């Protein structure tokens, strides 16, 4: 009898890429267990790309099916009223709703707006590194990788920075899908929803030059305006997923460059190589490790029939290590052709936050390694603890020695 892999098991999280590779070689689309329910895991690159582009695999957890309870793992512990606020944005909707939302948001959340923030991101980065000091061992995630994206996203949305601690607490509960902490997870979700509801209302009456105020004002002759629920959901995604993805990128990037000194040397010799190094960091260890879909009808992916009403987990991180797409995929190589990696998704749901994440990653890593030429890990590489989350992989604590 074949054993169905359990994605919550200790053995999986000890070396998840090894498990992904074994599954991909035998069955790139395979049944698994996750959070006590049956699901299908997609680990092959071609199969993942096909799944992410197939609109029969729904992104919308609010859709109703006769006699079927739709369960998206990301909403573990969320009360239904709270879940709906998290599920009314571009990433959690299907066409035509998705088309309308993306069209409206893209009018204001533009590459130009993000690029205009570069001087401010560089300033915040320099200030944080000044506060870190110049010697000894510090937790670079706590002191740098975490506060930088929070400061940036707070300024982008017009949020008072005094709420930084709350964001950290909310996100730490929400990102880890632990059934034993479902109640606390649901409470954190409710608190952040209430905060955003209040923020949206304040921006309606006291608009500023921030992105949230701009999204409130945006209107289209055909598509109207964004509703209060839509604004709340979009702000939630930007605040939580937006800043946490960048935290993970900076933390993982620091770890990878310090544990691959030959690659760090390449970037130091040629600073123009850093943008591609960031792409390789994203490919090598994708922060958004899986993407959830729900089969609205039977779908064949990679020759495997996925039954109607099945939960499908597309493993972006596993697909990025498929040797059919990326030769010698387990080698970290900052000169690699990384085009086509799936860390930002695929198709109509390609992540709109990519320019901001890349900007923060490039600015942060350039400044960090420029400021501290002797930077080294403060603990053994094998002792680094990885977040046990298929929602967003990352490192919560990374001690580094500033002066070597």
UniProtKB/Swiss-Prot annotation:
What is reported when this gene is inactivated? Gene disruption leads to the accumulation of 6-deoxyerythromycin A, an antibiotic with increased stability at low pH.
> Where in the cell?
Cytoplasm
Keywords, sorted A to Z: Antibiotic biosynthesis, Cytoplasm, Heme, Iron, Metal-binding, Monooxygenase, Oxidoreductase
| Residues reported to bind heme | 351
Cofactor(s) recorded for this entry are: heme
Q: Which GO terms describe its biological process?
A: erythromycin biosynthetic process
Gene Ontology terms: cellular component: cytoplasm
| Catalytic activity of the protein | 6-deoxyerythronolide B + 2 reduced [2Fe-2S]-[ferredoxin] + O2 + 2 H(+) = erythronolide B + 2 oxidized [2Fe-2S]-[ferredoxin] + H2O
Pathway(s) annotated for this protein in UniProt: Antibiotic biosynthesis; erythromycin biosynthesis
| Record's signal peptide | none
Task: Please list the coiled coil stretches.
Answer: none
Claim: Metal-binding is one of the keywords in the record: yes
Q: Which GO terms describe its molecular function?
A: heme binding; iron ion binding; monooxygenase activity; oxidoreductase activity, acting on paired donors, with incorporation or reduction of molecular oxygen
Q: CDD domains in the record, alphabetically?
A: CYP107-like (cd11029)
UniProt-listed Enzyme Commission number(s): 1.14.15.35
> What PANTHER family is this protein classified in?
CYTOCHROME P450 YJIB-RELATED, P450, PUTATIVE (EUROFUNG)-RELATED
Task: Quote additional remarks.
Answer: The bound substrate forms no direct hydrogen bonds with the protein.
Stated name of the protein: 6-deoxyerythronolide B hydroxylase
Gene from which this protein is expressed: eryF
């Amino acid at each position: 009898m074949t054993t169905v892999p359990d994605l919550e098991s200790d053995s999986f999280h000890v070396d998840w890429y090894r498990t992904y590779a074994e599954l991909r070689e035998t069955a790139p689309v395979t049944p698994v267990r996750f959070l006590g329910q049956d699901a299908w895991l997609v680990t092959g690159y071609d199969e993942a790309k096909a799944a992410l582009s197939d609109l029969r695999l729904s992104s919308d957890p609010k859709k109703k099916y006769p006699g079927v309870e739709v369960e998206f793992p990301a909403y573990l512990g969320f009360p239904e009223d709270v879940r709906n606020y998290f599920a009314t944005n571009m990433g959690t909707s299907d066409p035509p709703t998705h088309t309308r939302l993306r069209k409206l948001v893209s009018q204001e959340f533009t590459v130009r707006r993000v690029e205009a923030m570069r001087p401010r991101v560089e300033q915040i980065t320099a200030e944080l590194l000044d506060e870190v000091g110049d010697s000894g061992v510090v937790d670079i995630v706590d002191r740098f990788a975490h506060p930088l994206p929070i400061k940036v996203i707070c300024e982008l949305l017009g949020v008072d920075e005094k709420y930084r601690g709350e964001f950290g607490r909310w996100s730490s509960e929400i990102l880890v899908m632990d059934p034993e902490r479902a109640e606390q997870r649901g409470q954190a979700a409710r608190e952040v929803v209430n905060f955003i509801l209040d923020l949206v209302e304040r921006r309606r009456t006291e608009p500023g030059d921030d992105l949230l105020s701009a999204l409130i004002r945006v209107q289209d002759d055909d598509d109207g305006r964004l509703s209060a629920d839509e604004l709340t959901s979009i702000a939630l995604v930007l605040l939580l997923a937006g800043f946490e993805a960048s935290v993970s990128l900076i933390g993982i990037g620091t770890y990878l460059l310090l544990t691959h000194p030959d690659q760090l040397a390449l970037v130091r010799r040629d600073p123009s190589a850093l943008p591609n190094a960031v792409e390789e960091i994203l490919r090598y260890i994708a922060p958004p490790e899986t993407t959830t879909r729900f089969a609205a009808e039977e779908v064949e992916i990679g020759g495997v029939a996925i039954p109607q009403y099945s939960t499908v987990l597309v493993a972006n991180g596993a697909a990025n290590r498929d040797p059919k797409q990326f030769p010698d995929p387990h080698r970290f190589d900052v000169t690699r052709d990384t085009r086509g990696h799936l860390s930002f998704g695929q198709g109509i749901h390609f992540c709109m936050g990519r320019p901001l994440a890349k900007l923060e990653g490039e600015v942060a890593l350039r400044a960090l390694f420029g400021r501290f030429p002797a930077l080294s890990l403060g603990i053994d590489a094998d002792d680094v603890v990885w977040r046990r989350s298929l929602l967003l992989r990352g490192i919560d604590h990374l001690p580094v020695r500033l002066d070597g």
